[in-house]
Amino acid sequence: VLYNLFSRGIERDVLPTCTRYGIGVMTYGPLNGGWLTGKYRRDEPAPDDSRAVRLGAVQGNRWDPERAANRTKLDLLDRLRELATTAGLPMTHLAHAWAAEHPAVSSVIIGPRTPAQLDDAIASADVTLDHDLLDALDELVPPGTDIDTVDTTRPEPQLSRRVRRRPR
């Protein structure tokens, strides 16, 4: 299930339910499609190797910095960079460590695209965030908050007409 600092909706129902019944949760997307790497900045073009450039034409305005949700992300990223710098962490390490912090999360799928991204993700495996930093992150993005519903909305094949109706 998707879980990262910008997509925290599962904290409302999925994670508490899994905790109650002793079920471990495998999450993915700890970098929110690259947003939490720190590479996206206000008034700067997206890097050439970024998902925004590679998939921008296919995914429409999802990466448009003028979208309201993306403006919110850019505002939050300014503060997240400050918190990461104060903690002496790269943004990616902060994001990976945060995603693994919830007690119901048993595993975080990292999804690197390059060997350098893999090395960076491996280096973040031993990072532990202190309670003050976790509290600051909760203040910034309150528990249970989804910044952008586009991130958490996926086609649900089980709701398609083909699956819900008998063949005629």
Question: Residues of each region from the PLM?
Answer:
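Hydrophobic faces of well-ordered beta-strands that scaffold small-molecule active sites
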Residues: 1, 25-27, 108-110
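Conserved, mostly hydrophobic/aromatic
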Residues: 18, 25-28, 80, 94-95, ...
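Aromatic-lined glycan-binding groove of carbohydrate-active enzymes
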Residues: 10-55, 90
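Conserved active-site loop/cleft motifs that coordinate metal ions or position small ligands
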Residues: 92-95, 107-111
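Alpha-amylase-like alpha-glycosidases and glucanotransferases acting on alpha-linked glucans and related
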Residues: 2, 19-21, 102
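Terminal-tail/helix-coil boundary detector
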Residues: 43-86, 101-106, 115, 119-168
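Active-site PLP-lysine loop of aminotransferase-like
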Residues: 2-9, 29-31, 97
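Positions that flank functional sites
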Residues: 32-33, 99, 114
